[in-house]
């Protein structure tokens, strides 16, 4: 095998060439095995959802389940009074597959059903592993699979939508908590009420959390039980498909927060002990249980598990029209330790034999499959260790993700706000942090996501303003803490979004500084949705200051989108001075200037730029965004020649930059 581009692009990886090539060869060998040496495609292999589970046929129904440890399986449901009848007994076929064919009148759309699985020494009720619809009884809270075969099913149109990744601007959202009311929101409400807000705000992609069915609402969707079922607490499959189609009509891509890093422990609702075999889907021994998440870890070395998970990826793309995935918990998959207690200080930590090569192989195959099914699909890795090659091309020796989350950035901002007084905020440190990434891998930059909004943590705006958000967000209050918070909120988001090399992400409501943390209904809060909703009335009320942040956010995105391939343009630092707390950098014809100094405004502060005329296109101090309006944004700024820099073709751009403000200028001539 020739030297891979991953190593050519980073000479520091040369000592680990054998390990990198070994992982790459593992992927090639596994792909050859699964595709019968290329006689079929990965997409052909990943079509299990068309075979397993319940399907309507021309003359009735057919149901199949993989349960090699079972001795007997019955379908029970509302159609047979939940009794084990011979008529509903499955027959064992080859390779641990069980099958039953039923006449058309044996069940109907809307019927509830489960399996009763028998094995040596026991039996139990189970929801089918490939169930595409699972519902919960309002009174008993019991989950059951549901026959889903409407007379007029929603047909997903042939794929013509092409996501706009120039740049990718992601709105992270959750269907259930997207509404104003103290309740669980629905797909229809999101489509009718929330999508228009997102489109107006300027985002071109939504990343939806908690789609795969999960027994406990408060898990935020991360303890999945039924991997092929769209959560029924939000509505029907048809309603989710219509939501996605409507988003496409608005120019918005839809990606799913997919959970393949672990599964819920539940045995009746989930896969935990499907047919009396606790290791049917999961690793044996100590590796079966995740020590931190109270969940189960898939056995990525088992072909049947790879088949299940790859089919799951293809299912959501083909059956619902999703445009891709954000893979949750990738760090947990990559390492035997799940990354817990690891520092990841040097490259040796990525190639020391503590990595799960089976999981690495699965993730790489998943990326190959997803892009085979849809070449325009988007894949994003949530990964905190910094594993090299994660978002590099497979043929270059990488794992094939399109993007990786820049998880260092929100950590940096929270640490800065928590631990440093304003006078100690260092622009050199900020710039290094937001641009600290591998040159051959694209990232999704973000100041905060849902992680920072969860109960026990605080959003950026709440850390900045805290209790004053309850009393002083009205216009005219002139509260110092509020004014400071809004100013820094705008500056932090501008610095984060304007230095992207791939995309930018915002969590639902944070664009306008949504107050308080997220606390899902649970026994400890009386099962209330009060803190698991979005208070849109705050941003809609023009007597409050929330809309200043939302208006700035929208114009910030407009500025970014006005530059073709903005994310691909070099970020060139012009100046930083930690004493003054001033930072300036350029992208194409745009100059970004920040003054983080809390007290000192600067007159005629000079920056060396290419000669020309510069005009203000965005200013955090604009009164329209809650600023003080200390500068005239209509003034044109002409550069001043200096013989010292004539050879470098640079001239001085001199500006008045008020304290705690940022401005974006465009070279117009």
Predicted stretch roles:
Residues 65, 115, 173, 198, ...:
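Conserved, mostly hydrophobic/aromatic
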Residues 135, 153, 157-165, 170, ...:
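Substrate-binding/active-site clefts of carbohydrate-active enzymes
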Residues 63-67, 73-77, 597-613:
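Surface-exposed beta-strand/loop patches in extracellular or lumenal glycoproteins
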Residues 321-323, 341-529, 561-606, 613, ...:
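Conserved alpha/beta catalytic core and glycan-binding cleft of carbohydrate-active enzymes
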Residues 1-58, 62, 83-84, 89-172, ...:
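The feature marks proteins involved in alpha-glucan
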Residues 489-510, 545-552, 556, 655-657, ...:
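C-terminal substrate/ligand-recognition segments
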Residues 109-113, 588, 633-669:
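C-terminal beta-strand-rich structural cap/linker in extracellular carbohydrate-active enzymes
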Residues 367-368, 374-375, 534-573, 659, ...:
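Aromatic- and carboxylate-lined catalytic core of secreted/periplasmic carbohydrate-active enzymes
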